[in-house]
């Protein structure tokens, strides 16, 4: 599943490519995603201009004029493909946004766990009301994290992945951030000291920022709208490195399951 860095890369690309473009029409080839596509999406968007593109958590928000927004979530395997001329449609091209200059944006999703909906301003505010803090903001620091973790008896990795507390830090970046901070994923969240919280907040920011600069991580499905792959996976310390030596100490990387998810860590470096 694309996590915060991948969605940020996509949002930045779309900001450069489709901001201020007028939508000529919207074609829906498959309405049956996990959450149904807004039924009158073509009527709502035809002739409208995209004023802004931004990200909230793992959602891409395209603000349309001043009254509404298109909300897109890529789910497990979704992609947004930007094309500058007509191309043959693929099997899983579910939604096609055609612009007045004949460029188009295609939502492709083999597993159909994605989301494409249109919301008015009030609906948009309510939709995002339960999401946690953005970890790349100035507000997210050691003090904030320490308060967030107080009295939380869950393991620290599961807390980092809780989007109601902190958005966008998925499995990959939780594992990598904890390694960089030298904190074991087995630790209870409430037991982290202020110094550890400060270090972890810094390393979450560093890990996410490094991943964005590298174009994200391409493991299976993820690609940028241009078709380019990300390459942050080449810089992983622990994720996917089971039975391989730690880059820091040569200890063998350990794989365990936490809350149904794979967790990779070095039990020598992380404590």
UniProtKB/Swiss-Prot annotation:
Summary of the function given for this chain in its UniProt record: Involved in base excision repair of DNA damaged by oxidation or by mutagenic agents. Acts as a DNA glycosylase that recognizes and removes damaged bases. Has a preference for oxidized purines, such as 7,8-dihydro-8-oxoguanine (8-oxoG). Has AP (apurinic/apyrimidinic) lyase activity and introduces nicks in the DNA strand. Cleaves the DNA backbone by beta-delta elimination to generate a single-strand break at the site of the removed base with both 3'- and 5'-phosphates.
Record-annotated active site: 2 (schiff-base intermediate with dna), 3 (proton donor), 58 (proton donor), 261 (proton donor)
Catalytic activity of the protein: Hydrolysis of DNA containing ring-opened 7-methylguanine residues, releasing 2,6-diamino-4-hydroxy-5-(N-methyl)formamidopyrimidine; 2'-deoxyribonucleotide-(2'-deoxyribose 5'-phosphate)-2'-deoxyribonucleotide-DNA = a 3'-end 2'-deoxyribonucleotide-(2,3-dehydro-2,3-deoxyribose 5'-phosphate)-DNA + a 5'-end 5'-phospho-2'-deoxyribonucleoside-DNA + H(+)
Cofactor: record remark: Binds 1 zinc ion per subunit.
Matches recorded under HAMAP family: Fapy_DNA_glycosyl (MF_00103)
Binding site for DNA: 92, 111, 152
Family: Belongs to the FPG family.
A Gene Ontology biological process term: base-excision repair
Gene: mutM
Assembly and interaction partners: Monomer.
Name this polypeptide is given: Formamidopyrimidine-DNA glycosylase
Annotated EC: 3.2.2.23, 4.2.99.18
Pfam families: Fapy_DNA_glyco, H2TH, zf-FPG_IleRS
Organism: Wolbachia pipientis subsp. Culex pipiens (strain wPip)
PROSITE patterns (alphabetical): FPG_CAT (PS51068), ZF_FPG_1 (PS01242), ZF_FPG_2 (PS51066)
Disulfide bonds: none
Keywords on record: DNA damage, DNA repair, DNA-binding, Glycosidase, Hydrolase, Lyase, Metal-binding, Multifunctional enzyme, Zinc, Zinc-finger
ZnF (FPG-type) intervals: 237-271
Superkingdom, taxonomy of origin: Bacteria
Cofactor(s) the protein requires to work: Zn(2+)
Gene Ontology molecular-function annotations: 8-oxo-7,8-dihydroguanine DNA N-glycosylase activity; class I DNA-(apurinic or apyrimidinic site) endonuclease activity; damaged DNA binding; zinc ion binding
